[in-house]
Regions:
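Short amphipathic alpha-helix that is part of the acyltransferase structural core
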Residues: 2-37, 136-174
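Structured helix-beta-strand junction loops
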Residues: 30, 34, 96, 191-192
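Conserved beta-hairpin
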Residues: 40-71, 142, 186-207
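Short beta-strand micro-motifs in enzyme catalytic cores
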Residues: 55, 127-131, 193-195, 217
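Acyl-donor-binding surface of acyltransferase catalytic domains
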Residues: 60-64, 68-143
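A conserved beta-turn-beta hairpin within the catalytic core of GNAT-like acetyltransferases
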Residues: 74-75, 211-219, 229
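Flexible, substrate/cofactor-facing loop regions flanked by secondary structure
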Residues: 138-217
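Conserved glycine-rich acetyl-CoA-binding loop
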Residues: 221, 225-234
Length: 234
């Protein structure tokens, strides 16, 4: 028997904390590419907020409305009333997330309600394609690209910082001098999720597996050294 949802009142809209991992997995399985960031957490740790680094919200039934609220706010399913309820819940709670991620038809209306309370976004990418391969690539991989070793952290970190500044527009070393970002990058290397091509000790190409479910791996942090661009490395 499914565990009953735990209801919370948010401006007369009932928002519940999801506790049934089976229902969540059914929803995530219907969109394995779009839900990869959430699926990798749920499949490993279930729906316990402490284990997955955030809460899973629903307003009615999980197959009708679902939103992940953690370091990222990720609406996965819902109509206009559901999105409004999720926004009100986020506005009424201490802010945790730094970005909204997901399908534009869900993220953009959610952000329109949040913007008045949270202030202007640093960047709104309303047309950012989500690309996926459904078959093996038609070109051969670069044999020089390999997993990064821990002793190469310093060299790899230089490229990672350049990538972050170019992609996000801010320096990841702000605030704590880069200690937190260094730990994050070191964690990716330790997990075997950081890949690069080195030439004379310098990174000329890098990419990372940010999230990984049993069926989908999300490639992020792709970067090519400026002097090596235009050669097909990317």
């Amino acid at each position: 028997m499914s565990a009953p949802p735990l209801y919370r009142l948010t401006d007369e809209r009932r928002v519940s904390l999801v506790r049934d991992v089976g229902q969540v997995r059914e929803v995530l399985d219907e969109d394995p590419v779009g839900s990869c960031m959430v699926a990798c957490r749920v499949l490993d740790y279930g729906v316990d907020p402490n284990a997955i680094g955030g809460e899973l919200w629903t307003r009615r039934r999980v197959d009708e409305s679902l939103c992940y609220a953690g370091a990222n706010l990720i609406p996965l399913r819902g109509g206009p009333d559901d999105i409004a309820a999720f926004a009100d819940k986020a506005l009424g709670s201490p802010r945790r997330c730094s970005s909204l991620v997901g399908r534009a038809e869900l993220v953009l209306p959610l952000w329109r309600r949040l913007e008045a309370g949270w202030g202007a976004a640093r960047d709104v990418r309303d047309e950012q394609p989500l690309m996926a391969l459904s078959a093996p690539p038609q070109c051969a991989g670069d044999p020089a690209v390999r997993p990064v070793r821990m002793e190469e952290l310093d060299a790899y970190l230089v490229a990672a910082i350049e990538m972050f500044i170019g992609e996000v527009g801010i320096d990841p070393r702000m605030g704590d001098g880069g200690r937190g970002y260094r730990r994050r990058v070191a964690g990716l290397i330790a997990a075997g999720r950081a890949w690069a091509r080195f030439e004379d000790g310098q990174v000329v190409f890098k990419a990372e597996i940010g999230s990984q479910s049993p069926t989908v791996g999300q490639i992020q942090g792709v970067w090519v050294h400026p002097e090596w661009r235009g050669r097909g490395l990317g």
